[in-house]
Amino acid sequence: MNMQDANKEESYSMYPKTSSPPPPTPTNMQIPIYQAPLQMYGYTQAPYLYPTQIPAYSFNMVNQNQPIYHQSGSPHHLPPQNNINGGSTTNNNNINKKKWHSNGITNNNGSSGNQGANSSGSGMSYNKSHTYHHNYSNNHIPMMASPNSGSNAGMKKQTNSSNGNGSSATSPSYSSYNSSSQYDLYKFDVTKLKNLKENSSNLIQLPLFINTTEAEFAAASVQRYELNMKALNLNSESLENSSVEKSSAHHHTKSHSIPKHNEEVKTETHGEEEDAHDKKPHASKDAHELKKKTEVKKEDAKQDRNEKVIQEPQATVLPVVDKKEPEESVEENTSKTSSPSPSPPAAKSWSAIASDAIKSRQASNKTVSGSMVTKTPISGTTAGVSSTNMAAATIGKSSSPLLSKQPQKKDKKYVPPSTKGIEPLGSIALRMCFDPDFISYVLRNKDVENKIPVHSIIPRGIINRANICFMSSVLQVLLYCKPFIDVINVLSTRNTNSRVGTSSCKLLDACLTMYKQFDKETYEKKFLENADDAEKTTESDAKKSSKSKSFQHCATADAVKPDEFYKTLSTIPKFKDLQWGHQEDAEEFLTHLLDQLHEELISAIDGLTDNEIQNMLQSINDEQLKVFFIRNLSRYGKAEFIKNASPRLKELIEKYGVINDDSTEENGWHEVSGSSKRGKKTKTAAKRTVEIVPSPISKLFGGQFRSVLDIPNNKESQSITLDPFQTIQLDISDAGVNDLETAFKKFSEYELLPFKSSSGNDVEAKKQTFIDKLPQVLLIQFKRFSFINNVNKDNAMTNYNAYNGRIEKIRKKIKYGHELIIPEESMSSITLKNNTSGIDDRRYKLTGVIYHHGVSSDGGHYTADVYHSEHNKWYRIDDVNITELEDDDVLKGGEEASDSRTAYILMYQKRN
């Protein structure tokens, strides 16, 4: 070769031009000699790799254009080679560039040449066995694409083939694959199996069983299904029904081997169905025999279970028993009921129970109780409500039939609000007013469990430094009032960084700080840390006594100091007359305390913005509850969200109406018509309602009186006044009043009052007071202090003043019990008529008693008896002294004349 020819030819290597070494003589070694190059880059490259560096896999590992030669299954034969003579062409129109000199050999395209190197007649070419890149080869058709390829991927054997010289070669050779065939990218598409129907015997039949047979697989599926049913603790009837369904599915599925409960969707051809159908009878017989054996075992197990059920009663009862069951189970149940022995109730399969539960929930969503608001979405046009009045603190101006009642706790699962983050105090207070399940939901929430101040109460005394026994006795009684502590705990979860700061909730924060010291966990952690120097001498004794009683109550040295609480009270205007060291009335302090908490919560609600109200309404997932919220928003007339209401909020209030829509004046009068017993219409009566804005405190302690004043010869025959109350004051001055029930009846007796009619005549009016609504926590005060007038010698009464009269204490014993049922005589007729729960709505249990010791009203001492629900015990707390009591000890006091301890305030809670 001259230099001019070398310049014309493009070089592929930096090494001198050499010819490929001759391949070794074919032997029986099962190793590949030459392999196709491996593409290393995403673009066209032609790297030179030695044959031993390439894995001998006959699969498309790199991409779909990877060269896979059909001779790979037979390592004795080299792949055919493209024409490397400059004058020849290939089928795929590759640009052939000469690398090595050829001496006229014959290529696979039929071009002739001299066989200078291949003189041995072995049928093998001594030229380069592969091209530099697979794109230049016309033989990169994969062997798997050929329908005629065998399991060893070899080509059709030809006994006679001509070599390059035209002579017949005796050694066997293989014809090349048809180069006109194109590579099929979708060769594994199951729809193309129709084209290979004639060769379906060589295809893999599905389902494929490895190390097993079709009958064994079906039997194993039956056993696995039975084990799953036993794990679900179902009865034998459901197992038999499932086995019948599974058996029928076994005869109709395409694969004829997979049970119904584990069936998979498969695409098969008609030819495969015929092949599988030929194999079905043998597998079906084996499965049928196995099913008979398992049914015999299930019958024995069913009898054993029936005997156990007859001997042992059912612990639980399925909630849904009215639904229709499958026919098989009905027939079995009828056969069982014919026997004289008692049979257990037929249980349902788990799928039937689940479907019935869904149906029952849907039905319960459609059915609305009489005390609930009709379920209507917010986008609706009307909202149905019940015709009864509001609950205890819903003391409205209206007696319209559109008034809705406080939603009761639901039997169905509670849908909690979807709140985001910590809410302000006003939002929490609103939820507690109108969502009866909100308090219990918050207390069950694990996220706020560690934030509440009081988890479990440990009895502790309160140090009496300056005649504050009236305050400590009230705080102790409220501490053991569980509904009140629940309200305090939920209010403690508020967002303290909201616009309504702590300055407007002084008493609430003081109560939280005070009651946190009675928490058992807090006390146990700080048992020794908070001991004063004066108490260190008794520290070890207190520790021993407390541990010996498992912290049931603390020693005297561990009493709570009320200094901070008292200091906070002195800064509140309502308690401005409170003087340190001056004795006060316990009932008066209790009333002021509840009033102040009520006002602070109302102030927090009034401070809510329109945006906060919209967020709260959006978080409510119960449509009935949402409508009830909207109807009560207008009761907060001084609130910012009412004064600056957005058009959207105004639209909602106008759509669903308001609770009090009969009068615009806060304490206005309105007229209602009545009727006599004979059915004739009487004169109209004036009705006046004193409105109280709802708060968590008023919902808990607030009730309502109905005072009826009958005026003869007057324009209005009756005057009805609805007044709220937090404490019922019972007069016990009458000699016939010796027990609590008689005091209630005496409370509702009519009294005659002088009255001037509308015509100007003096008449005698008759007045009666009834209980219209009962609170959840009933506070009762005995009127033990009465004013006694001095009488002169002529038996003429003198002026009513402090100089001519005196205040004396009524020290007689008033009997009361642990249970109280409000007599019907004390309830209003409307309440009794609308009451659906009967006597249970008037049933209470005793939880606290405040005693007064002494004979005068301006002195004496206060103690308290409290019921600890967690310990199920009564404790008597006298400042720092705590004594455990029997139940009967609480009912004693005042029997003897020398005993000045008499019950003054009773606390009753409604029984759940």
Curated annotation (Swiss-Prot):
It holds the Pfam family UCH. The keyword Hydrolase applies. Residues 249-259 have a biased composition (Basic residues). Its EC number is 3.4.19.12. InterPro entries: Papain-like_cys_pep_sf, Peptidase_C19, Peptidase_C19_UCH, USP_CS, USP_dom. It catalyses: Thiol-dependent hydrolysis of ester, thioester, amide, peptide and isopeptide bonds formed by the C-terminal Gly of ubiquitin (a 76-residue protein attached to proteins as an intracellular targeting signal). GO terms for cellular component: cytoplasm; cytosol; mitochondrion; nucleus; Ubp3-Bre5 deubiquitination complex. Residues 1-11, 260-310 have a biased composition (Basic and acidic residues). Gene3D superfamilies: Cysteine proteinases. Heterotetramer with BRE5; contains two molecules of BRE5 and two molecules of UBP3. Forms a complex composed of CDC48, DOA1, deubiquitinase UBP3 and probably BRE5. Within the complex interacts directly with DOA1 and CDC48 in a BRE5-independent manner. Present with 2210 molecules/cell in log phase SD medium. Has an ATP-independent isopeptidase activity, cleaving at the C-terminus of the ubiquitin moiety in natural or engineered linear fusion proteins, irrespective of their size or the presence of an N-terminal extension to ubiquitin. Plays a role in regulation of silencing by interacting with SIR4. Also, in conjunction with BRE5, cleaves ubiquitin, leading to the subsequent mono-ubiquitination of SEC23. Required for ribophagy, a process which relocalizes ribosomal particles into the vacuole for degradation in response to starvation. This is Ubiquitin carboxyl-terminal hydrolase 3. It comes from Saccharomyces cerevisiae (strain ATCC 204508 / S288c) (Baker's yeast). The gene is UBP3.
